[in-house]
Amino acid sequence: MNILWDFDGTIFDTYPTIVKAFKELLTDQTISEEDILKQMKISSDVAIKHFDIEKSLFDKHFHVLEQKINPKDKPAFPHVEDVLSFADTNVIVTHKSRQSTLDILAFFNMEHYFTEIITKDDGYKRKPDSGAYAYLHDKHQIDLVIGDRELDLKPARELGIKTCAFQNDDIEADYHLTSYDQFFTTVVNKNS
């Protein structure tokens, strides 16, 4: 099985650090982390508009703030390595920078699982544009896309690739997981 993965909130539990970095950009510090997370789980663009943050301010400061947070505070989800080990090929499409992505993977000694990684530095349009997915699908014959947001799964559906929503029952997907220990009974056994 060849799997295309989202990174934040799918392989690694980075949302607490993403929310922390985003909150530093807000002038109103009374806004709850739950409210920020709710918007960020849709997309950063939705959160920027919702909280009335200037896009130029976000672009200039957010990734710098988030990258300063120690990788140890961005752990891999339990049992995700079982799925990574099972797959024949794993690839990533992320809006993170290449350096930040590689730093986290290296910190947790997980870079060896991935054949190819596409980051914001590679020049593809942001998800939900399907360009990066189409490139990886043509090259690696992707069987499944795993992500936690609608924008992660929409490009896969456009390309006719099966989808798996992680910790998000509110989005359309072929499979839904709340934990990766469900992967083999929910995804693999249903495809056998």
Where are these regions (language model features)?
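Short, acidic loop-to-helix structural element flanking the phosphoryl-transfer center
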Residues: 68-92, 98, 102, 130
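A mid-sequence interfacial segment
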Residues: 46, 91-112
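Conserved Rossmann-like nucleotide-cofactor binding loop
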Residues: 10, 17, 98, 151, ...
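Alpha-helix C-terminal capping segments
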Residues: 22-27, 47-52, 79-89, 133-140, ...
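N-terminal helical cap/lid subdomain that shapes the substrate entry/recognition surface
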Residues: 2-78
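Conserved SAM-binding loop
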Residues: 11, 90-93, 145-146, 176
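Asp-based, Mg2+/Mn2+-dependent phosphohydrolase catalytic module
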Residues: 1, 102-192
